Amino acid sequence: MKQLIQIRCKNNKKSLKVEAGTTLSDIFKQLNLTLPYPPVCAKVNNKVEGLHYRVYNAKDIEYLDISSPSGLRAYTRTLFFVLCKAVQDLYPGTTVRIDIPVSNGFYCDLNIGRPVTEADATAVRNGMQTIINRAIPIRRHEVPTDEAIARFEEMGYHDKALLLRTTGRLYTLYYDINGFVDYYYGSMLTNTAQLTLFGLEKYYDGLLLRIPSMSNPSELGALIRQDKMFEIFQEHHRWQNLLGMSTVGTFNEAVREGYATEIINVSEALQEKKIAHIAENIAGKKTVKMVLIAGPSSSGKTTSCKRLSIQLLCNGIRPVPVSLDDYFVDRELTPKDENGDYDFESLHALNLPLLNKQLMQLFNGEEVELPKYDFIKGRSVPSGKKMRMRAGDVLVIEGIHALNPELTSQIPEEYKYRVYASALTTILLDDHNYIPTTDNRLLRRIIRDYKQRGCSARDTIRRWPSVRRGENKWIFPFQENADEMFNTAMIYELAAIKTQAEPLLEQVPENCDEYAEAYRLRKFLSYFLPIDHGVLPPTSLLREFIGGSSFSY
């Protein structure tokens, strides 16, 4: 007799009895459910699974399409898989590294023994489209890890073999498209025909894989040149080559061999060298009267600002901090968002006329009384603090809007030096699996919110989408305005914060929506061997989040 199990669908709040062992894909057909876009994965008891997944016990299921973050990740991973197969079909024995998110896509380094041409981009794009048009099933396999390692070694995927060796897992999942196998962290689509939209073109010395926009999945994300951002990525690769590691497997191997302290020391020294370089550039521009530092949430811009101030002093420049928090308009004048709530992240929550007026007065040698914002009363009050700039002074202004031209629209451009600080790139899981740098920032924020504000990981994860929307509106559009970009991520970072982040993530209960994200973060942290964060220097940028900094915040 066939065993029936009960499924509760969160999309339509209905229950359904199905045979044990039915796939999520087949359950969706039985539900007769309609989503804005076709389903690409599902939350099963608040854990994201691919539609291959078979259900053997009663479950709560929520189907996800490409307009969700988890859905877009599954779609993108499957595009990576098809790209890698197309490259192997066209250039057997060569490799492709899916490297960095840039220009609303992903930069792919195609190693074919010669410069990549427009013809190569066209050939790979056509090869991908052929695979998609053939509607090839994507099969999921679970095998002993030593068997998977042997398979990947035979294929020349030494980065994957090394990663799997260092995880200590008994079994490993991998996928295949018509005999071409690969390993991916996270759920995948079930058929190549589900990939209805992508773009591929030559970009610098490699390829740019373009993906659908999450806000409008029927269109590709806008192609925006990010030349300064790309140069930072290239610089980071040079640092990785110096350290001899670019993937988690090589990092874990170095940690096992006792090089953790050396990795930390070199990473910190390289970062300090970059900060010193920025300070020297500022000192070389005699017209600069203010340094503007911007970055998204948990980017480490506060510590970056403090360390840059020290380097400015070393160059004979006195940094004078100016807090944008004191320039908020009175609360009743604060703009409201689409929900009718005060939008404190809006540029227009700041008193821009007063800010520009006082800046010009300072630059003209006048004395001004700086404002003081009373956050309890919600209005500006007299501070009694007066300021006059002296020879050798440079104002240092840190805030999310610092790169927005409208913030200092009345200030001559030659007076300004703009710095964008963010966790831009760190390390790859392997050549086909990147780690989103937003995950670095989210983990930093989870730890800091718990330590400094008493917030749970669940609360931080719940608020994160709202934070990201604000960043997309007020920060990222202006990042290319920077005179300098500073990558605040470090190659050892995730291994150092792992021991603090994991216990907080484990406290997120399975019966809440935030569990899926907490589980995903725990899963990718599990790939890293932990390192002792006690050896981090007191000026380390990570200390802003994990504690023990010699700076005051």
Predicted regions and their residues:
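Conserved lysine of the Walker
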Residues: 301
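Short beta-strand-centered segment that lines the nucleotide-binding/catalytic pocket of NTP-utilizing
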Residues: 314-332
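Conserved nucleotide-sensing/catalytic segment adjacent to the nucleotide-binding pocket
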Residues: 320, 333-376
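Glycine-rich phosphate-binding loop used to anchor ATP phosphates in small-molecule kinases
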Residues: 356-414, 464-478
